[in-house]
Amino acid sequence: MKLSIFFVLFFIAIAYCQPEFLDDEEDEVEETLPVAEEGREKSCITWRNSCMHYDKGCCFPWTCVCWSQTVSRNSSRKEKKCQCRLR
């Protein structure tokens, strides 16, 4: 009799506590997910010399955008800059 009461209480405790364990796991996943996304975004938004060959291509939905820019105010020399950006 005592053993059956023990098992009943044991199963009630498991059923009562189990949702808390699941919620904790979901919270842990939500906490680590932004860190992974942030790392991915940093690797997607990188400066490059050209958009050709896409060795380290832009991550979707980012696209490679290039433009020419003068090196300094008094210089006529232009430099090509490329960067992954959202369009």
UniProtKB/Swiss-Prot annotation:
MF term (GO), any:
calcium channel regulator activity
Coiled-coil residues: none
Domain comment in the entry: The presence of a 'disulfide through disulfide knot' structurally defines this protein as a knottin.
Disulfide-bond pairs as recorded = C44-C59, C51-C64, C58-C84, C66-C82
Q: What does this protein do?
A: Modulates Cav2.1/CACNA1A voltage-gated calcium channels (P/Q-type currents) in rat cerebellar Purkinje cells and hippocampal CA1-CA3 neurons. At saturating concentrations (>10 nM) decelerates activation kinetics and slightly increases peak amplitude without affecting deactivation kinetics. In vivo, does not cause death when intravenously injected into mice. In rat models, through its activity on Cav2.1/CACNA1A, has an ameliorative effect on memory defects provoked by hyperstimulation of N-methyl-D-aspartate receptors (NMDARs) in the hippocampus.
Which tissues express it? Expressed by the venom gland.
Write out the propeptide range(s): 18-40
Q: What is this protein called?
A: Omega-lycotoxin-Am1g
Task: Give the keywords, sorted.
Answer: Calcium channel impairing toxin, Disulfide bond, Ion channel impairing toxin, Knottin, Neurotoxin, Secreted, Signal, Toxin, Voltage-gated calcium channel impairing toxin
Cell compartments where the protein resides = Secreted
* Record carries keyword Disulfide bond: yes
| Signal peptide per UniProt | 1-17
Give the family this protein belongs to, as stated in its UniProt record: Belongs to the neurotoxin omega-lctx family.
Using the UniProt record, give the first listed, main subcellular location: secreted
Q: What else is known?
A: According to the nomenclature proposed by King and colleagues (2008), 'Gsp(267)' comes from the species name 'Geolycosa sp (strain A267TDLS2-KZARNA)'. This species has been reclassified since that study, as indicated in the work of Oparin and colleagues (2016).
GO cellular component terms attached to this protein's record: extracellular region
